[in-house]
């Protein structure tokens, strides 16, 4: 992933030095277990840690060896032997490359999950704070992009909070599923390695053992992981699009913070564009682009082929780095979002009271009118107002069918905006609990 959409902690997780350090730990913990079982000398296991436990691996040297071997794990083991010496013969005993690669990937995805969960927590905190700030701020709810009935801006933010709370739960579940270790040998039968080695390495790295593997950990786990990232990205996009629509000039109910000295256009000095949320919409597409190849990786040949490898070398760092950046950016957008309650109220009033049509319909039916008649009476008064003529309440009061069913006072009461917000506390209690 390019630096523009990257943050240091997640980038460092995917750096070669980090990967080689995890590879070493897998090999060294395996040697510890083999020493305890009596397969290799205990002094050799200690020597491996003493001679290579704190070294900085020479990435260029490993690349140089790989140009000859055409095999990354062998290149690493060759370089490792340059530090360890004769005891290196006990490293990787009974193991296959995928034991190292898959277990390392599990560690990296587990750690990436921890970063992403922390990102979601920061976003949840921002959403909660702003939701309470605008808990009772009236705004128009839209269906199909068209004015429907009043909501509050706080409810919009509470909705996003509930969605990202689900995202957090999915990430926790994905972390759990991906956190598996497989050190079972060439085809998963433990023919040349004791299962206790796998158990020891898994415990040391905070993983579970894979119940049954082939040469690799089954890729349905990875498909579920990247699918989860795709869903989280889609939630980011949904919230981004909501903000982008609200920032449109003719709406302008909210907008991204526009900093001192910021420019919106090279040609038009007046422009204030929703560039952050537009950017987030694009980044969400990139995260989702990892989902299909991750699904296709599930169907490997027999006990394993290598078709998944090139895919994962790209999508694992790219999707986690991108989602980390996107979540942090979204938290910043919400934290600094500029809200215009006066424009929300202005937009609420644009349709001359039509947003109360359902209340009138229901009141008429409760007074004895059939639903079909009531709907026709309300609609015939609504359409002229929709076309820009007249006031809805005034037209209803003048309608003979409506006026003989409802008094003018009763009609007036139906246009009370506060009626729509009487359950806001209930909804907030459901979303946020007693907080």
Regions found by a protein language model. Give the residues of each.
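A helix-coil-helix interface module used to build multimeric assemblies
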Residues: 1-184, 190, 194-200, 209, ...
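Residue-level signal for inorganic ion chemistry
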Residues: 38, 280, 323, 374
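Short amphipathic alpha-helical segments with heptad-repeat character
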Residues: 110-121, 128, 158-161, 165, ...
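Glycine-rich cofactor-pocket loops
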Residues: 132-154, 253-271, 302-311, 335-355
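Glycine-rich anion/phosphate-binding loop at the beta-strand->alpha-helix junction
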Residues: 167, 215-308, 313
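A short, charged helix-loop
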Residues: 200-216
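C-terminal alpha-helical interaction appendages
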Residues: 336-405, 421, 426-433
């Amino acid at each position: 992933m390019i630096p523009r959409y990257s943050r240091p902690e997640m980038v460092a997780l995917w750096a070669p030095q980090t990967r080689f350090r995890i590879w070493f730990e897998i090999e060294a913990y395996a040697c510890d277990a083999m020493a305890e079982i009596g397969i290799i000398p205990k002094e050799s296991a200690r020597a491996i840690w003493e001679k290579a436990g704190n070294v900085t691996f020479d990435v260029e040297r490993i690349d140089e060896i790989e140009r000859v071997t055409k095999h990354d794990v062998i290149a690493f083991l060759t370089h490792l032997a340059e530090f360890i010496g004769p005891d290196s013969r006990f490293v990787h005993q009974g193991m296959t490359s995928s034991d190292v690669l898959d277990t390392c990937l599990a560690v990296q995805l587990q750690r990436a999950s921890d970063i992403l969960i922390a990102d979601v927590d920061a976003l949840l905190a921002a959403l909660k704070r702003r939701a309470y700030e605008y808990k009772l701020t009236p705004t128009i709810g839209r269906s199909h992009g068209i004015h429907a009935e009043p909501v509050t801006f706080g409810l919009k933010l509470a909705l996003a909070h509930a969605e990202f709370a689900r995202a957090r739960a999915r990430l926790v579940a994905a972390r759990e599923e991906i956190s598996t270790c497989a050190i079972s040998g060439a085809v998963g039968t433990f023919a040349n390695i004791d299962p206790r080695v796998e158990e020891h390495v898994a415990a040391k790295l905070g993983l579970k053992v894979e119940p049954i593997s082939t040469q690799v950990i089954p890729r349905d786990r990875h498909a579920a992981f990247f699918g989860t990232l795709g869903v989280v990205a889609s939630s980011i996009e949904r919230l981004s699009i909501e903000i982008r629509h609200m920032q449109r000039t003719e709406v302008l109910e909210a907008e991204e913070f526009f900093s001192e000295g910021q420019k919106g256009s090279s040609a038009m000095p007046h422009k204030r564009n929703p560039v952050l949320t537009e950017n987030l919409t694009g980044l969400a597409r990139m995260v989702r682009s990892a989902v299909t190849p991750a699904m296709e990786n599930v169907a490997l040949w027999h006990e394993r082929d290598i078709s998944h490898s090139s895919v994962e070398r790209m999508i694992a760092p790219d999707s986690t780095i991108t989602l980390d950046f996107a979540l942090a950016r979204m938290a910043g957008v919400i934290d600094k979002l500029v809200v215009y309650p006066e424009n929300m109220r202005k937009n609420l009033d644009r349709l001359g009271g039509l947003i109360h049509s359902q209340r009138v319909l229901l009141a008429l039916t409760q007074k004895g009118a059939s639903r079909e008649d009531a709907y026709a009476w309300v609609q015939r008064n609504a359409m002229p107002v929709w076309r820009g003529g007249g006031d809805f309440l005034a037209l209803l009061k003048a309608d003979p069918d409506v006026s003989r069913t409802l008094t003018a006072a009763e009609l007036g009461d139906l246009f009370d905006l506060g009626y729509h917000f009487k359950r806001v506390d209930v909804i907030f209690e459901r979303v946020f609990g007693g907080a």
